[in-house]
Amino acid sequence: MEKLARLKPAFDPISGRGTLTAGNSSPLTDGAAAIWVATGEGLSRLPNATPRVRLVDFEMAAIDIFNEGLLMAPVTAIPRLLAWHGLNFNDIALWEIHEAFSAQVACHIRALEDKKYVQEKAGVEHTFGSFPRDRMNPNGGSVALGHPFGATGARILSQAVKELAAMPQASRAIVSICADGGLSTVALLQN
């Protein structure tokens, strides 16, 4: 931790206010990922050991990064998706949140727990409870596992499918991905 604390900021090394370092940012890695999206009939042709879950719903959001913050679109999409399905944070067994930067996920959690912020940005008047940090990225997120540019969504989704398929029946997961600064796709999965 002491060595991480001594790393110089990558984007603002002069002012002393920069916070993004090689220690708290996801590495852009080489990689590829693929997922199958199929009907029940299509799944019947795959081996029984193949992890499988149901895509219940998804929500996309776009924000103005100059007024609402860089990489904050998931905070608009997540509350909308949960509210449409009458769910609270604790109804979700697994949260796979893309962490381009560690601080970005910390900002997401703080904003999601702020009722006023959720009302203003997502247009949702609902209290979701305390965010269950122990259910988020339990096997590591993008900072730990890498950020294969162009394949991050499939990497995170396939990780969520594998983890969710091993959980008790009817468990739910949220997969949240931010992109291009002001975009987000959030999916609700169930096994």
Predicted features and spans:
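N-terminal extracellular/periplasmic Venus flytrap/periplasmic-binding protein-like
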Residues: 1-45, 113-118, 122-135
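Phosphate-handling active-site elements
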Residues: 42-52, 88-89, 163-173
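Short, conserved aromatic-histidine micro-motifs
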Residues: 48-58, 62, 171-183
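Internal helix-turn-beta structural module
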Residues: 84, 127-189
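Short beta-strand-to-turn element immediately C-terminal to the catalytic PLP-Schiff-base lysine
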Residues: 36-40, 83, 188-191
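Active-site pocket-lining segment
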Residues: 56, 64-144
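Active-site pocket-shaping loop/turn-to-helix segments
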Residues: 17-33, 58-84, 97-99, 145-155, ...
